[in-house]
Amino acid sequence: MKIGIITDIHSNIQALNAVLNEFDKLKVDKIICCGDLIGIGINPEETVQALLKRKEMLIAVRGNHEQYLLKGLPKEIHDDKRKMSEKEIANHKWNHNKLSDQSINFLRSLEISQNIELGGKRLYIVHYPQQADGTYKKHIKNPSATDNVEMFKENDADIFLYGHTHTFSVNNINDKWYINTGALGCPMNSNIARAGVLKINDEQIKFESINVEYNVKEVIDEINNLKFPFYEEILKIFY
């Protein structure tokens, strides 16, 4: 079985299409998305609709940006315990207003996490591991294998898939895999969309990171032309 892994698309339809085309070439059987389909970028509706076209092969969970849409914006940002600025709030509302009812209903149907079995292996899928109160655990950008074991100690699986930090990380310890493919839709001074392919054959697990090139300048130009709320900060932080 061949499984395409993505996370943190963040409304970047150009990056998503580049990765989906690569998945088509590789003939993946399933696509797993670890949350944050929307937010930050300029094409939330197109992003959700592109995934809906592959709904039969898609397994996805909610990220914090889906929670912002469905549960309301938080009083403070979970990672750095600060209040959202007025510009950030306006940006989220701008992003949310571009979504159709169909897309919102699809995002509402997503669970916070999933425990599934594929190819005889148990997978745990989540945007980021949570504490008992539903808030995210400590934000670790470059976790060690020991960090991963601690992060997911309440969960039992052979393969743990997550995102949120936007950074690539893979650890394999005690016959367990911990995989974060990095943000697909936030190139951060690169010209690539990040993804991965997980292969499960005859009880063996293999993982390959894939970096798909696309025209990031075109996306940046669109953002500059739109001049939507918080766009300058978004370009500086995520592009």
Residues covered by each model-derived region:
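Active-site neighborhood of phospho(di)ester-bond hydrolases with catalytic His/Asp-centered motifs
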Residues: 6-7, 31-36, 59-64, 126, ...
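Short active-site segment of divalent metal-dependent hydrolases/proteases
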Residues: 11, 38-39, 130, 167, ...
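Metallo-beta-lactamase
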Residues: 87-122, 146
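Beta-strand-turn-beta hairpins that frame and shape the catalytic cleft
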Residues: 1-3, 115-124, 173-177, 204-206
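Anionic-ligand binding region
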Residues: 140-171, 177-178
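Active-site-proximal segments of metal-dependent phosphoesterases and phosphodiesterases across multiple
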Residues: 82, 86, 119-153
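Acidic, His/Gly-rich catalytic cores of divalent-metal-dependent hydrolytic chemistry
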Residues: 171-239
